[in-house]
Regions:
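Conserved donor-binding/catalytic core segment of Leloir-type glycosyltransferases
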Residues: 5, 213-230, 235-240, 251
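Conserved acidic donor-binding segment of nucleotide-sugar-dependent glycosyltransferases
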Residues: 337-338, 342-349, 358-364
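N-terminal subdomain of nucleotide-sugar transferases
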Residues: 1-61, 172, 242-244, 406-413
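Short hydrophobic beta-strand element within catalytic cores of glycosyltransferases
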Residues: 294-297, 315-326
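Carbohydrate-associated surface elements
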Residues: 179, 200
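Membrane-proximal helix-turn-helix segments that form the acceptor-binding/catalytic region
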Residues: 92-95, 99, 116-119, 123-127, ...
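A short, well-ordered alpha-helix in the C-terminal region of glycosyltransferases
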Residues: 351, 358, 365-379
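Nucleotide-activated donor-binding/catalytic signature segment of Leloir-type glycosyltransferases, i.e.
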Residues: 253-254, 259-287
Length: 413
C-alpha cells in the first residue's frame, strides 16, 4: 500500500477545524490501509497550557504515527514579527525533520495555512521524489489582509509570489470550500488539478442525539474561534438587543484574540444573559451544542470571507440546531441549500435579534430547520464518503469530472 507523509502545523489533539480535518483525513486513510506518517508540531493552538488536560488526549494510537517538532516560540500572537517568527521556526524545523527522514514516500500531503508550511512540503517533494498534494483550507495572504493583520507591501509581494509558486508546484490541490475554486484557477492553475473535499463529520458525530428542550428557556450558542474574522462583538450587541427576553440566554464557548474584548464589552454593558465558557475538547463542545436550542455563526464583512464556510456550521448541522448567521457568500449559500437557518441579509443587530426571536417562539420551526441541516450533512458531509476524493487522487484515478462537478454545481444554480 502507498506511503504518505502528512505535514501539518495543526493536528490532534488541538481544537479547531484545521486539526480536526487533518485528524480525520489521517484516520480515514489508515482505515483504507495506507501507511501514513504525520509530521506536526506540539499542540499549541490557541495555547500550549490547554493540552496539559488529559481529556484532550483521547486516542493514544494516533501518536504511534506522529512525529512532532518542538518550537521554542510557544504562543500565537497578533504581533506580526512574533507570528512570522513562529511560522518560520516551524517550517525550518519541519525541513530539518524531513532532511533526517530516510523513509520513502509515494505522496507528500501538506496542509495550509500557513503558506509557510507549504515550503516544507515543496522541500519534501524534491527530496523524496514524491508527488505533492496541497490541501487548501484558507486563502493566504488574502485572509490576513481581510482581518487587517498586515498590509506591508514588501511582505505581501513576497507572500503572493510564494503563493503562486506553492500552487504551481503541487501535483494536485484539494480545497475545502467551493469558493476557493475561481481564486486558485485565476492564478493559472488547470481546473483538472483541483478537487473539492469539504470538512466533514464522522459516523459517531452524526450519531449524537440532541437534547429536547421541554421548558420555556432557550440557549443561543456560539463555539470556536473568537478572533479577528468572527466579529463576536456584534453577538454581544444582539444579546443586549434581546436582554428584555428573559427566556433567551447566550452561551459562548471559545478562544481567540477578541475573547477578552467581547467579555469586557459584556461587562461594560452589564449584560446578565451571556455566559462565557473556557474552550472544551471537541466531544464536550458538541455535547454543549446538542443541549442548546439555536446556533450562531458570523464572519466579518470582507470579500475574502465570502469564500469560506466556518467549520462550526457543519458541527451545528450534525446535532440538528437551527442556525442564525451573520455571513455572506459561500457560507450563506450552504445554509440556504441546506434550508437549516436564517441568514441576515442586511447584517444588522436588529435583524439577527429578530430571527432569534422568531425561532425562540416556534419550536416546530426550530425542529424542522435542525432536521434539514442534519439531512444535508448526512447526505453530503460524511468523511466516510468524502475521503474517496482523496483516495482517487492517491490511486491516480480521474477525479476531475465528479469532484469539480460538486465544486462548481452551486455556481450554475
Amino acid at each position: 500500500m502507498k506511503k504518505i507523509l502528512m505535514i501539518t502545523q495543526n493536528f490532534y489533539p488541538e481544537i479547531g477545524s484545521a486539526a480536526n480535518r487533518m485528524k480525520n483525513i489521517y484516520l480515514e486513510l489508515k482505515k483504507k490501509g495506507y501507511e501514513v506518517t504525520v509530521l506536526t508540531s506540539d499542540p499549541s493552538y490557541p495555547n500550549r497550557n490547554l493540552y496539559k488536560d488529559e481529556s484532550y488526549w483521547c486516542d493514544e494510537t494516533i501518536e504511534q504515527d506522529t512525529v512532532r517538532i518542538h518550537p521554542r516560540t510557544r504562543k500565537y500572537t497578533r504581533n506580526l514579527f512574533r507570528r512570522l517568527m513562529l511560522y518560520i521556526e516551524v517550517v525550518l524545523r519541519f525541513i530539518l525533520a524531513i532532511g533526517k527522514d530516510k523513509a520513502k514516500y509515494d505522496y507528500v500531503f501538506v496542509s495550509t495555512p500557513s503558506i509557510f508550511v507549504a515550503a516544507a512540503g515543496m522541500f519534501a517533494k524534491k527530496k523524496m521524489k514524491a508527488k505533492l498534494i496541497l490541501d487548501v483550507r484558507d486563502l493566504w495572504p488574502e485572509s490576513l489582509i481581510g482581518v487587517g493583520f498586515f498590509n506591508k507591501r514588501w511582505i505581501l509581494k513576497i507572500a503572493y509570489k510564494f503563493e503562486y509558486k506553492m500552487y504551481h508546484t503541487a501535483d494536485q490541490i484539494l480545497i475545502n470550500s467551493r469558493g476557493f475554486f475561481s481564486y486558485i484557477t485565476s492564478k493559472g492553475i488547470d481546473p483538472k488539478r483541483i478537487s473539492f473535499m469539504p470538512n466533514s463529520l464522522t459516523e459517531e458525530e452524526l450519531s449524537v442525539i440532541p437534547a429536547e428542550n421541554t421548558g420555556d428557556k432557550l440557549t443561543v450558542i456560539y463555539t470556536g474561534n473568537i478572533g479577528l474574522a468572527q466579529d463576536i462583538t456584534k453577538l454581544i450587541s444582539v444579546a443586549e438587543y434581546l436582554q428584555d427576553y428573559k427566556n433567551i440566554t447566550f452561551k459562548i464557548i471559545g478562544y481567540g484574540y477578541k475573547k477578552n474584548i467581547a467579555y469586557d464589552m459584556m461587562k461594560m454593558k452589564k449584560l446578565a444573559n451571556i455566559q462565557f465558557l473556557k474552550p472544551k475538547n471537541r466531544e464536550d463542545t458538541l455535547a454543549e451544542v446538542a443541549s442548546a436550542d439555536i446556533a450562531y455563526v458570523s464572519l466579518v464583512e470582507e470579500d475574502v470571507f465570502k469564500k469560506v464556510l466556518p467549520g462550526k456550521v457543519i458541527d451545528y448541522m450534525s446535532v440538528k440546531k437551527p442556525i442564525v448567521a451573520d455571513v455572506d457568500g459561500y457560507a450563506k449559500e450552504v445554509i440556504g441549500e441546506a434550508k437549516c437557518g436564517f441568514v441576515a441579509e442586511n447584517r444588522t443587530v436588529s435583524e439577527l435579534g429578530d430571527y432569534i426571536i422568531k425561532l425562540a417562539s416556534d419550536k416546530q420551526l426550530r425542529k424542522q430547520l435542525g432536521e434539514n441541516g442534519y439531512q444535508y450533512a448526512f447526505q453530503t458531509l460524511r468523511w466516510k464518503t468524502n475521503i474517496e476524493t482523496l483516495v482517487q487522487i492517491l490511486e491516480e484515478k480521474d477525479v476531475t469530472e465528479e469532484s469539480l462537478h460538486v465544486c462548481m454545481e452551486s455556481f450554475h444554480k
